[in-house]
Amino acid sequence: LLAFHGGDGDEGDFPQQDQFDALAGLEDFIVAYPIADSERTVAEGEWYLNSAATSREDNDYAEAIVDDLSKVYCIDDSRLYATGYSLGSMYTYEIACQLNHRFAAVASFAGSMPVEPETCNMQGRMAVMHIHGKLDYLIDYHNDWDWKDGEHEGVGTMSSVPGMIDFWAEKSNCQNSYSHYHLEVEHIVHNECNGDVRIEHYGMELHEHTWPEQVGGTYTYELIWEFLNHFSN
């Protein structure tokens, strides 16, 4: 499991990092916390978004981490996952689009992805879970929005969260969906999808941009791992 930090997040721990580490010990998986290139400009952002298939700097970095860890540990290559927070969440959708031949699933909080991604070809299969506060003041939940008012024009318009969930449901040709509310959280599930994946969303009615300790009564780190752990590629 690779956990990608948010903007300016390289200076501190990943949210619930101690809990992720403890869970990894119990569940026998490896979690790694990549640090972005500190020399990038504010307009570029710590993680490159909406990169074409020929622009693979961060993707190569993610794969290199997995390859290096595989030289030391016994890793099941069919069970590679990514999570992230904010900008790190946005980057997990680069992995979902461009590294789905290796990674099986992504689950993250408070990100989005471009409305028109440069490259998003399904060579493997990709399960997606996204958690988001509906009162998020940085990453708009309900509407498409322009990335930093044109500072990084290569990224383009970013998707609303409902639009992004629909994108992945269509990408995996999901044939069924259902939803329910619990503790001010809307839970949407798209299933009967290609490759037996699921596309899930937790919309937190009263939450903003900060990483939540719990989602609908379940610790966030546990919810993320419970989802990811269902899938292999």
Segments predicted by a language model, with ranges:
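Alpha/beta-hydrolase
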Residues: 2-4, 109, 204
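Active-site-adjacent alpha-helix of alpha/beta-hydrolase-fold enzymes
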Residues: 134-198, 214-218
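Short beta-strand/loop motif that positions the catalytic acidic residue
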Residues: 130-132
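Catalytic active-site module of serine/aspartate enzymes centered on a nucleophile-bearing elbow/loop
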Residues: 217-233
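Short, proline-enriched alpha-helix->beta-strand connector loops that line the catalytic pocket
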Residues: 122-128, 195-199
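Acidic beta-to-alpha connecting loop that harbors the catalytic carboxylate
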Residues: 7, 36, 134-137, 144, ...
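Primarily recognizes the serine-hydrolase "nucleophile elbow" in alpha/beta-hydrolase
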Residues: 70-72, 77-126
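Serine-hydrolase catalytic machinery in alpha/beta-hydrolase-like enzymes
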Residues: 1-81, 91-94, 98, 213-218
